[in-house]
């Protein structure tokens, strides 16, 4: 049976009639003098709800929010969050350091509130990280089911341990059942998933963890097979790849962004090896995200966390917190993610196999209970 409805925090907007905010000046700007070079004292953005006072006297939220960016005012008076490398000579960039609104920029850090009855419920902004904290799989399952019903954009960020730990089949299930709208991963995830599909091993080992003869080269043979086909998509079409995560993404038309690193073998065709281009491709998805699940990958989780706002704007519900779930066997990663500024993240300290298996069963029960 389905549990009680998930408690959702209510967003309370700032009182712009208060003396300080009503009398605040329009956010000052300075002109960019050279491409990619920000003015001194540029305002550095956070991932929290932010408002900018325009020259028309109105407070508005900038578009495409993220942390570690700047605020650029376009010719129509609309404010956008942009990475510093993207500014161009002549752009108007907001300057100032104050976040309390007195200089025309307000970071509304405490806008989300729970009703008293739900004060002790599972939620994101105040979640602490501990391996001793029980995992409320039902609440996470409810989130996923709600997002699918609303046709949200759920991003999954995956590390290779997900493939090695037998959680692969469960991720395939989530993809095939409409719970994944984008997959962000590195070359290794795709390589070992495809190795499993073609050779039947990951890192040369069977699903029981037993080494195979010549297994050290299995991943290279998988890469070579995809290179022969020309692309991952072509390898699915010609049935070189007949199952697994990448196969499911291609068949279900789920976009995937594979980013390279200095340690990669191959890489596979389609892997983005330019770090800035990879960031841009990932950012195209984080701008659309309504939920994010990160599993067993430190660098990718932190990179995506840096791009995610803590909220998004829903046409029906207004400003909504962006649920971000970070799963890892180590408390270090999930704590590090929060320390780096992804305050909305809920840390789940467990291994990928257990998490994916239990979550799938719980989601299936949630779907059955809603019928």
List PLM regions with ranges:
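Long terminal accessory regions outside catalytic cores
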Residues: 1-79, 83-88
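Gly/Ser/Thr-rich loops at beta-strand to alpha-helix junctions
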Residues: 99-100, 158-165, 188-191, 264, ...
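Gly-rich Lys/Arg/Thr-decorated short loops/hinges at beta-loop-alpha junctions or inter-strand turns
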Residues: 113-128, 223-229
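C-terminal functional extensions of proteins
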Residues: 206-207, 211-256, 261-292, 297-371
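Short acidic, glycine/serine/threonine-rich loops at helix termini
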Residues: 105-109, 166-170, 193-199, 268-271, ...
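Active-site pocket-lining segments that scaffold enzyme catalytic pockets across diverse folds
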Residues: 144, 148-156, 160-178
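Active-site histidine-anchored catalytic micro-motif
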Residues: 154, 172-175, 179-226, 294
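Loop/turn positions that initiate beta-strands
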Residues: 88-96
